Amino acid sequence: MTGRMTGDDAIRRKIEALATTLTLPTVKRALGTLEGEHPSHRRFGSDDIMDIRPYEPGDEARRIDWRTSARNGRPMVVHRQRQVTSRVWMLMDTGREMTGSCESGEMAWQVAANGLRMFAALSLRRSDDISLVCADSASITRVPFHGGFAQFEHTLDRALERPWNHARNMDALLDYARRISDRNALIVLATDEHALGEPQLATMRTIARTHPMVVIDVATINPFVARRRAVADADTGRRLPALLINAVSASEVDTHRSYLAAQLEAELQAGGSTLMRASSSEAMFRTFVHTVSISLARTGFSTRPATVVHARDTAGKAGDRA
């Protein structure tokens, strides 16, 4: 238990340092859809002057800057840059299936939560508004949050202090995401690799048409390679018989889950969404930094939302519950 807490503290320190180690131009360029406070592309903002021109028939009278007009002796229309703030919706699967174990010894919900913290660290640096939503078969709860990263961590920790005795309801969570009206809002969905089937992918394709979307996909342990731990089914509590633990079974599970992961990545990529897949918090951190770094190289200095390159933890393996 001590080792696990020490590891959790270590990854949290890395996450806290993430926003400070990335320079502001890097954050601005790399995040793409994670823009926070940034110049709006709408006209007639309220900050830096972008353009001044004489008033023409058809221009709205409210666009006239009277001080500039007085200096020029004629009506002048001023185009200004204005700052806008993006919203990030973080949707967390809190079904009991998320108590499945990963290769690192962490539970799936712990890895998923650390993935959300990584997004929050950079989003809050950009002054984004964050909405946190937790869902299982019993309820869907929007958790109030206001403040900085420390407050977000506290809010997330409190939200995850639960008995974890209700099954997941991914359909309801995706339906919640589908009803988010702000089409400029980024949706970050955190779940494990067993949650998304064809019906869910169909809904996600619909969401991806209207919203930028990132899926945090946690790979759980392969039960046929967990030799030092007794693996049990999360729903029934039945343990895996020792006679079934062999290399052939392990290879078959790895092959099947690698295929499913590749299928999920292809589906998300086709819709312009991003997959971040890992089997531990450390692997998730590396995947996150790699994704941001490649996006940095591709997006240049543009402040418009850009599709983030897909990065997957190839070493991460999936598995059943421990």
PLM region descriptions:
Residues 2-41, 54-59, 68, 73-114, ...:
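Exposed, interaction-prone extracellular/peripheral surfaces
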Residues 44:
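Short glycine-rich loop/turn motifs that provide flexible caps or phosphate-binding loops at active sites
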Residues 50:
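Small-residue-rich anion-binding loops in enzyme active sites
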Residues 61-63:
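N-terminal juxtadomain amphipathic helix
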